[in-house]
């Protein structure tokens, strides 16, 4: 999650959604009576026909829910403001919030609890180093909360200078990129460019950095204009989502190893996890997204458990359906905890 802006006077937070966990956090902090500003679509009658029209509205929140089988948060409420010509103020509406969307949340007063959850989620976001490369130039940058920092912007030697110059230039870019990776320790690298030179650089990077995930994409130029272009793409959100899924897979692998060697350090099932939480024993909990998908007593119980885990500095990992560990976890009741210490 990125906190794009917080207006203290209006008590308004503008957010960019980057992962399933972000949607879950919003599900927890949105309350009845809050207002949200977001883009949506609605069927509008045009004479004898109707058409789905895109628009930005202000919605007074009634309740929220996860929609089954999609990475989506549904926000139900009453339209407080919308373009006058559509005549839909006061109507019921549902905003579908997806990964990659932006939303403004306005509260009467943000509680310290809700603000802390937002800030904690923003601090969790993975770091990406972006390298735009072409035969004659390259640019390296890293996104931060406050904006994009250009780390390097240089020209490369001309292809006409000598034989083997492409490989030499690729090594030059990869070597400098590796230095920044060591300095900033990003979770992933995005290499983009207009031609095949990016693949040459990727080979060198993979030789130097064995354990960093490298994503490759195309962009029109290795310039600041190209950087602006890539930042508007869905690739950034995909990388964030992939990273969250990879973290879950590693934790599940750890849990399976413990089940085989030290089974007393793992517990699963709602009641068992709840008991472990009450004893302050939970280090990490993994749960499938289905458990937060509907308005029922089980979901409310799970939300209370997760709140207790956070208060006791435990880690929570929400596992989406596209995760490779989803069905494995579902077969273990859908909720599993790795423990800090043995309990009876």
From Swiss-Prot:
Pfam families on file: eRF1_1, eRF1_3
Keywords (A to Z) from UniProt: Cytoplasm, Endonuclease, Hydrolase, Metal-binding, Nuclease
Transmembrane segments: none
Cell compartment(s), UniProt: Cytoplasm
SMART domains associated with the record: eRF1_1
Cofactor(s) named in the record: a divalent metal cation
Keyword Hydrolase attached: yes
Enzyme class, UniProt record, top EC level: hydrolase
Entry-linked HAMAP family: PelO
Subunit structure: Monomer.
Function statement: May function in recognizing stalled ribosomes, interact with stem-loop structures in stalled mRNA molecules, and effect endonucleolytic cleavage of the mRNA. May play a role in the release non-functional ribosomes and degradation of damaged mRNAs. Has endoribonuclease activity.
Domain notes: The N-terminal domain has the RNA-binding Sm fold. It harbors the endoribonuclease activity.
Family: Belongs to the eukaryotic release factor 1 family. Pelota subfamily.
Name of the molecule in the record: Protein pelota homolog
High-level lineage: Archaea, Thermoproteota, Thermoprotei, Sulfolobales, Sulfolobaceae
Gene: pelA
């Amino acid at each position: 999650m990125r906190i794009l802006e917080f207006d203290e006077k209006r008590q308004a937070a503008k957010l960019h959604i980057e992962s399933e966990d972000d949607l879950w956090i919003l599900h927890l902090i949105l309350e009845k009576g809050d207002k949200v500003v977001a883009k949506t679509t609605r069927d509008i009658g045009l004479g004898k026909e109707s058409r789905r029209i895109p628009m930005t509205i202000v919605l007074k929140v009634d309740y929220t829910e996860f929609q089954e089988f999609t990475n989506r948060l549904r926000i139900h409420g009453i339209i407080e403001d919308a373009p006058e010509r559509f005549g839909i103020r006061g109507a019921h509406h549902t905003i579908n919030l997806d990964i990659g969307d932006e939303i403004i949340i306005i509260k009467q007063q943000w509680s310290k609890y809700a603000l802390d959850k937002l800030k904690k989620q923003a601090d969790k976001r993975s770091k990406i180093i972006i390298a735009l490369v072409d035969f004659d130039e390259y640019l390296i940058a890293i996104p931060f909360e406050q904006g994009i920092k250009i780390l390097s912007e240089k020209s490369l030697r001309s292809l006409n200078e000598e034989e083997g110059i492409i490989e030499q230039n690729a090594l030059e870019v990869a070597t400098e990129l590796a230095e920044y990776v060591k300095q900033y320790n990003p979770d992933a690298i995005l290499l983009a460019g207009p031609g095949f030179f990016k693949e040459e650089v990727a080979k060198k990077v993979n030789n130097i950095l064995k354990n960093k995930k490298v994503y490759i994409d195309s962009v029109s130029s290795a310039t600041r204009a190209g950087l602006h272009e890539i930042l508007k793409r869905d690739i950034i959100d995909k990388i964030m989502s992939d990273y969250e899924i990879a973290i879950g897979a590693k934790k599940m692998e750890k849990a399976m190893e413990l089940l085989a060697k030290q089974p007393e350090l793992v517990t699963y099932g709602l009641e068992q996890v709840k008991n472990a939480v009450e004893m302050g024993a939970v280090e990490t909990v993994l749960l499938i997204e289905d458990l937060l998908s509907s308005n029922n007593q089980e979901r409310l119980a799970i939300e209370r458990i997760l709140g207790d885990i956070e208060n006791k500095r435990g880690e929570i990992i929400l596992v989406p359906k596209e995760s490779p560990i989803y069905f494995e976890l579902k077969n273990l009741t859908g909720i599993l905890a790795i423990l800090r210490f043995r309990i009876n």
